[in-house]
Regions:
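Acetyl-CoA-dependent GNAT
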Residues: 2-71, 82-84, 88-92, 138-142
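Conserved catalytic core of the tyrosine transesterase superfamily
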Residues: 37, 96, 102, 131, ...
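A short, internal acetyl-CoA/4′-phosphopantetheine-binding micro-motif in the GNAT/acyltransferase core
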Residues: 66-74, 101-104
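Short glycine/proline-centered loop/turn elements that form peptide/ligand docking sites
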Residues: 82, 105-108, 125-130
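Conserved GNAT acetyl-CoA-binding A-motif
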Residues: 89-100, 123
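Conserved catalytic-core motifs of GNAT/GCN5-like acyltransferases
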Residues: 100, 113, 118-134
Length: 143
């Protein structure tokens, strides 16, 4: 997905709002512009209100971030973003997608499990104040 300067500004605003500045503008720009990256965005009235960003390396996808502005949550946007991200990853040859989430992020965990992700691992003490849970969704079985 190629972004205009205004679209990138909106994307960065969503990232900052949802993740409290976990990525710098430069980091987000680098990831968005990487040939390995997959970006999907949701818009309302021409404004980006949510996005999902990941990448595909060989046959594995990884979800880096998914965020929806608070006033647009609980409307199915995150599910739609994940579905589109998975479709694009599959087009690029991915057979599965991995993600990592804070163990106390109940809302995100509920979304991922609803969308078919399975918990495969726990990284104790990964964050200063929390563990990380690793999830995987298989798009198709490998031989």
């Amino acid at each position: 997905m190629t972004l205009t300067d205004e679209q990138f500004r909106q994307l960065y605003e969503v990232e900052q709002t949802c993740f409290h500045g976990s990525w710098s503008r430069e980091t987000l720009s680098t990831e968005v512009n990487s040939p390995l990256s997959v970006l999907v965005a949701a818009q309302r009235d021409g404004r980006i209100v949510g996005f999902a960003l990941g990448r595909v390396v060989v046959d594995e996808g990884e979800l880096y971030q998914i965020g929806v502005l608070p006033e647009f949550r609980r409307q199915g946007i995150a599910e739609a973003l994940l579905s589109e991200l998975h479709a694009r990853m599959t087009e690029r040859g991915a057979v599965c997608c991995f993600l990592e989430v804070r163990s106390r992020n109940a809302g995100a965990i509920a979304l991922y499990e609803k969308c078919g992700y399975e918990r495969i691992s726990l990284r104790k003490g990964y964050y200063d104040d929390d563990d990380a849970v690793i999830y995987r969704k298989k798009f198709r079985e490998t031989s």
